[in-house]
A protein has these predicted regions:
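Short, low-complexity interaction segments enriched in Ser/Thr/Pro/Gly
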Residues: 2-3, 33, 85-87
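Short aromatic-glycine-(Arg/Gly/Cys) micro-motifs in beta-strand/loop hairpins
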Residues: 2-28, 45
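N-terminal cationic leader/targeting segments used for protein routing and processing
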Residues: 3-7, 20, 37, 91, ...
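Ordered hydrophobic segments in well-structured contexts
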Residues: 7-13, 27-33, 76-78, 95-100
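A residue-level detector for conformationally permissive "hinge/kink" positions
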Residues: 22, 38, 63-66
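GIY-YIG-like beta-to-alpha core
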Residues: 28-40, 44
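Short, mixed-charge low-complexity intrinsically disordered segments
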Residues: 44-104
Length: 104
């Protein structure tokens, strides 16, 4: 799957470092710091009702743990996580992971 063919929404579960994520993912449709913000922002970004309904059902930590444990990627949860550290960022933990959802 080519990056320019997918539609991605990233939900940051702890810290909203918008600039970092926007630079890293060129195909990002929206970056939201919570599911509630994702639904509100998704409407503003023109996502379809079915995509918004999908976002509304997400339990971020459950989906993240399940997808990581199953080693899945693709339709339901394309999950990526950062283990990098720098002056601004703590090492990745369950409270600092984020999700990238392919909504196509």
């Amino acid at each position: 799957m080519k990056a320019n063919k997918k539609q991605t929404v990233i939900i940051v579960t702890a810290y909203g470092e918008d600039n970092y994520f926007q630079k890293r993912y060129e195909d990002v449709v929206g970056i939201y710091t919570s599911v509630k913000n994702a639904i509100k922002g998704a409407k503003a970004d023109g996502l379809t009702n079915s995509q918004i309904d999908y976002l509304n059902r997400i339990n971020a930590f459950y989906m993240l743990d399940k997808a990581l444990n199953e080693g899945r990627s693709g339709e339901s949860a394309q999950v990526e996580y950062e283990e990098e550290t720098d002056a601004r960022r703590k090492p990745c933990t369950s409270s600092y992971m984020f999700q990238s959802y392919n909504l196509n």
